[in-house]
Swiss-Prot record:
Its cofactor is Mg(2+). It is an enzyme of class 6 (ligase). This is Lysine--tRNA ligase. It catalyses: tRNA(Lys) + L-lysine + ATP = L-lysyl-tRNA(Lys) + AMP + diphosphate. It comes from Prochlorococcus marinus (strain MIT 9515). One of its GO terms (molecular function) is ATP binding. Homodimer. GO terms for biological process: lysyl-tRNA aminoacylation.
Length: 512
């Protein structure tokens, strides 16, 4: 590797010695590769089109055959072939003191960025090309591009050096284009329905709105601890109290938790709050929004995900947590009449692992669901009516005070969205926050703290409100048929690599 770098440094310095800059300041582009391929793909073999174009890209392939060369370059939109002929380039070089054909052969390596000027030509073999009249070096690459991508080690390298992944793996570019499109579509859909995007604090004095461990930092001037937000919920609700009836925020969330194919400590979500609505209204909103995104990104409401076919076009199933647990496990939690020990016995018979934290029927119900049911929910399914003890910010269910008006959406065996009829009763909310605080004081680091300012806001008065959160990364996984959340996050969190303390020594051939 060092020998290749040394050779390329020599080439960069040879450009300098000839009076040319190996790292250009700017370059004027007239067209993209995508435009040219779409506009002139109709040309017959051997046909030329007299349109002057200038474009730039990274060299991916290089073939030199005597006085003719063929390069392939790529830009953000695609790739195109360059047809380079010594006679044409050298004619321009003599008159304008430009880089010659020999310079092109000797100095340009795969990985370099170059800019070219020329006209349109389709070769006799049917390859649309730029017939190059002159060229410029825009950025000399000192390291070679990788040749192969296979095996665990290379997967790790794709995540650590995403720039290399994007260069050699066109599918990765497609994934991140789809991600950008998805985010843009969500914002546009909400904006068109008169939702207002709000920016809430990332640094917060209290970490609330979810059961999760926060990242902790310290503000030096104020000499206080601060937390990276684990949700945007409580601040968005404050905006509803203040009179904004339809609000949302699409942004980054931080949770000091594990890393897996489904979890990254830093992730993207959209939270949406709509006054005068309940969780049924938010269910309808969720279905409409996600169907719109899927159709726009995939051109169909039926998609392939891994080895499954998922049909978004049918009405989505809606079923309570108790009923879906009964359907998949045979356990009827209504039959236990509040007897936790009896429920534990039935749960252990189907190999449920029960931790000491599972000390209520509601928590046990949720544990059975997560261990035995969740992974089997492939088609879009709204699971409704959650236990109150795991939903401290949701409104009680009018028909069962031990449950709340909450749903989670599951697709392909993963949670994709979470929503409530929001709890707007300040007395009930205080009691539940006090219970959460007692759990936190007893060592549960994921339990909520009491947020006095939020409780004060509720006492001012909050209208009936439905709230919803959607995980953007998991949605993009579905849209792009990606098996790991790391595939859809440009720079996922990774454990640092062990590196040598010795830095590479500079040589006399450094570009100067």
């Amino acid at each position: 590797m060092s020998e290749i770098r040394e050779a390329r440094l020599l080439k960069a310095n040879s450009l300098i010695n000839k009076g040319f800059e190996p790292y250009a300041e700017t370059f004027k582009i007239s067209h993209s590769t995508r435009f040219l391929n779409e506009k002139f793909g109709y040309l017959d073999n051997g046909q030329e089109f007299d349109l002057n174009v200038s474009l730039a890209g990274r060299v991916l392939a290089k073939r030199v055959m005597g006085k003719i060369a063929f390069f392939t370059i790529t830009d953000q939109e695609g790739k195109i072939q360059l047809y380079l002929e010594k006679r044409i380039i050298d004619d321009y070089e003599i008159n304008a003191k430009l880089l010659s054909f020999e310079d092109l052969k000797e100095i340009v390596d795969i990985g370099d960025w170059i800019g070219v000027f020329g006209t349109i030509k389709k070769t006799n073999k049917g390859e649309l090309s730029i017939k190059v009249s002159k060229w410029e070096m825009l950025s000399k690459s000192l390291q070679p591009l990788p040749d192969k991508w296979h095996g665990l080690t290379d997967i790790e390298k794709r995540y650590r050096q995403r720039y290399l992944d994007l260069i050699v793996n066109p599918l990765s570019k497609t994934v991140f284009k789809t991600r950008a499109k998805c985010i843009s579509l969500i914002r546009r859909w909400l904006d068109e329905k008169n939702f207002l995007e709000i920016e809430t604090p990332i640094l917060q004095s209290e970490a609330g709105g979810a059961e999760a461990r926060p990242f902790i930092t310290h503000h030096n001037t104020l000499d206080i601890p601060l937390y990276l937000r684990i949700a945007t919920e409580l601040h968005l609700k404050r905006m509803v109290v203040g009179g904004f009836e339809k609000v949302y925020e699409l942004g980054r969330i931080f949770r000091n938790e594990g890393v897996s194919t489904k979890h990254n400590p830093e992730f993207t979500s959209v939270e949406i709050y709509q006054a005068f609505s309940n969780y049924i209204d938010m269910m309808n909103l969720t279905e409409d929004l996600i169907k719109n995104i899927v159709l726009s990104c995939c051109d169909s409401l039926v998609i392939n995900y891994q080895d499954k076919v998922i049909d978004f076009s049918k009405p989505w199933k809606r079923i309570s947590m108790k009923n879906v647990v009964k359907e998949y496990t045979g356990i009827d939690f209504d039959s236990f009449d509040g007897d936790l020990n009896k429920a534990k016995k039935f749960s252990e018979e189907i190999n449920i692992e029960i931790s000491p934290k599972i000390n209520t029927l509601g928590r046990l119900l949720n544990e059975v669901f997560e261990q035995k049911v969740e992974s089997q929910l492939i088609e879009p399914t709204f699971v409704t009516d959650y236990p109150i003890e795991i939903s401290p910010l949701a409104r009680r269910h009018p028909k069962n005070k031990e449950m709340v008006q909450r749903f989670e959406l599951f697709i392909a065996g993963r949670e994709l969205a979470n929503a409530f009829s929001e709890l707007i009763d300040p007395v009930d909310q205080r009691q539940r926050m006090q219970l959460q605080q007692s759990l936190r004081d007893a060592g549960d680091l994921e339990a909520h703290c009491i947020d006095e300012d939020f409780l004060q806001a509720l006492e001012i008065g909050m209208p009936p409100t439905g709230g919803l959160g959607i995980g953007i990364d998991r949605l993009v996984m579905l849209l792009t048929n990606s098996s790991s959340i790391r595939d859809v996050i440009p720079f996922p969190l990774l454990k640092p690599e062990l590196t040598s303390n010795k830095s590479e020594k500079s040589t006399s051939n450094e570009v100067k």
